[in-house]
């Protein structure tokens, strides 16, 4: 009897970036709420926990010595120092989740994403775009936390960031969160069906089938 092709159980690493105001956080939250096989990576940091933050949930809180030791052990997909504190994406915990069949989201900035791309070549890199720069402006203004000067700074930063879209595998325009989520779901499904992800399992199933034909 012919064996079934083994299911590809390894999860997919989904790296999501985009300019401030594009809606990255809202999209990631919607994906997490909708799918029980999608998880978000918990970053590590050396900063002190804020009120209500839980170690292992909001961040993995490390001492600077522990963080530097992990850097020496190459245990970060990416890391950076911001205002005297270190932040990074632990490689071992991401790999553990992927091996367990969990799809893992990294919502990180562009520089961090490009560093991850150097180490995680099988990751799926998605850039979230606003429908227009005018819409982006309105979204940022609605937050009510920007001065005219900081608003201009954000716009200049957004223009620069959008130039990096060609470094990503996919671009998703977020004119509607529900539609953007559907597009990412379609991307994830297509990535799961890629031959290079299934190749090892396909070969194993062929070997099992040949063994049955010869010895059964």
From Swiss-Prot:
Pfam families noted in UniProt: Guanylate_kin
Assigned keywords, A-Z: ATP-binding, Cytoplasm, Kinase, Nucleotide-binding, Transferase
Compartment(s): Cytoplasm
Any one GO molecular-function label of the UniProt entry: guanylate kinase activity
Binding site for ATP: 18-25
Domain Guanylate kinase-like: 11-189
Family: Belongs to the guanylate kinase family.
Protein biosynthesis found in the keyword field: no
Biological role stated in the UniProt entry: Essential for recycling GMP and indirectly, cGMP.
Reactions catalysed according to its record: GMP + ATP = GDP + ADP
Main location: cytoplasm
Annotated TM spans: none
Record-linked SMART domains: GuKc
InterPro entries recorded: GK/Ca_channel_bsu, Guanylate_kin-like_dom, Guanylate_kinase, Guanylate_kinase_CS, P-loop_NTPase
One term under GO cellular component: cytosol
Organism of this sequence: Clostridium perfringens (strain SM101 / Type A)
Protein name according to UniProt: Guanylate kinase
UniProt enzyme class: transferase
NCBIfam families recorded: guanyl_kin
EC number(s) reported in the record: 2.7.4.8
């Amino acid at each position: 009897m012919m064996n079934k092709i083994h299911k590809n159980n390894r999860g997919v690493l989904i790296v999501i970036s985009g300019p401030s105001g594009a809606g990255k956080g809202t999209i990631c939250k919607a994906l997490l709420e909708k799918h029980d096989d999608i998880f978000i990576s918990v970053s590590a940091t050396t900063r002190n926990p804020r009120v209500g933050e839980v170690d292992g949930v909001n961040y993995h809180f490390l001492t600077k010595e522990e963080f530097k030791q992990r850097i020496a052990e190459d245990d970060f997909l990416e890391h950076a120092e911001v205002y005297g504190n270190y932040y990074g994406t632990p490689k071992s915990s991401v790999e553990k989740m992927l091996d367990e069949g969990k799809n893992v989201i990294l919502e990180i900035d562009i520089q961090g994403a490009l560093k991850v791309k150097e180490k995680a070549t099988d990751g799926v890199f998605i850039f979230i775009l606003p429908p227009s720069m005018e819409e982006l402006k309105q979204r940022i203004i609605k937050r009510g936390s920007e001065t005219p000067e900081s608003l201009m700074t954000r716009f200049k930063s957004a223009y620069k960031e959008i130039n990096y879209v060609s470094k990503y595998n996919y671009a998703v325009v977020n004119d509607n969160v529900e539609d953007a989520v559907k597009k990412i779901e379609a991307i994830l499904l297509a990535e799961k069906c890629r031959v290079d992800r299934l190749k090892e399992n396909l070969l194993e199933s062929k070997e099992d089938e040949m063994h049955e034909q010869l010895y059964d």
